C-alpha cells in the first residue's frame, strides 16, 4: 500500500534490504496494534501484509539507494530501523531516532565512534583481512529490539 501519510505524523522507516524477517514481523504487529505508519524501503520487491499502516517503497537498485530514499524522507521524531551506520548518522542529524535490528540504539554520542570502527574494519577488509560478518540474530536480540521499539512507541503516545 503506497497511500500518502498525513504530514507531521511520526512514522517508522525500515532499511529493509538487510532487515531480518522476524524484525519486520515485530514492526508489522506494532503497526497493527498502534496505528503507527511503517514504511519498508528496499531496492527489490517486498511482500508486505495488507495492513492499513504498512507500506513498501521500492527504489531503483544501486549503492545506498534505499539509504538515500530514507534520508530524504525522514522527519524529526521518526524512527529508522537500520544496521547501516552511515544511514543512522544521517537520520540522527535530521532529528530522527535510529535503532539496529538487534535493538542497539544509535545516538549522537556514540555515532562518531561507530563510524570510526566501521571505517577501520573497511580498511582491514581492503587489506585482505577477513573480519567476518555479524553474528546470527538471537532471541535476546529480538527482545532488545522489541524493548527499544516499545520505548519509542511510548514516547509517541506521550506526545499525542
Swiss-Prot record:
InterPro entries: UPF0178. It comes from Xanthomonas campestris pv. campestris (strain ATCC 33913 / DSM 3586 / NCPPB 528 / LMG 568 / P 25). This is UPF0178 protein XCC2288. Belongs to the UPF0178 family. Pfam families: DUF188 (PF02639).
Amino acid at each position: 500500500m503506497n497511500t500518502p501519510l498525513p504530514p507531521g505524523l511520526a512514522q517508522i522507516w525500515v532499511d529493509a534490504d538487510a532487515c531480518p524477517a522476524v524484525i519486520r514481523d515485530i514492526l508489522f504487529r506494532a503497526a497493527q496494534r498502534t496505528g503507527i505508519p511503517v514504511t519498508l524501503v528496499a531496492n527489490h520487491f517486498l511482500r508486505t501484509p495488507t495492513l492499513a499502516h504498512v507500506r513498501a517503497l521500492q527504489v531503483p537498485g544501486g549503492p545506498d539507494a534505499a539509504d538515500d530514499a530514507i534520508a530524504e524522507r525522514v522527519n524529526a521524531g521518526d524512527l529508522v530501523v537500520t544496521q547501516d551506520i552511515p544511514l543512522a548518522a544521517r537520520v540522527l542529524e535530521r532529528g530522527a531516532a535510529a535503532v539496529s535490528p538487534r535493538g542497539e540504539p544509535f545516538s549522537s554520542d556514540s555515532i562518531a565512534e561507530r563510524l570510526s570502527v566501521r571505517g577501520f574494519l573497511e580498511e582491514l577488509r581492503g587489506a585482505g583481512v577477513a573480519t567476518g560478518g555479524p553474528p546470527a540474530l538471537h532471541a535476546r536480540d529480538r527482545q532488545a529490539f522489541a524493548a527499544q521499539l516499545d520505548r519509542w512507541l511510548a514516547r509517541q503516545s506521550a506526545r499525542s
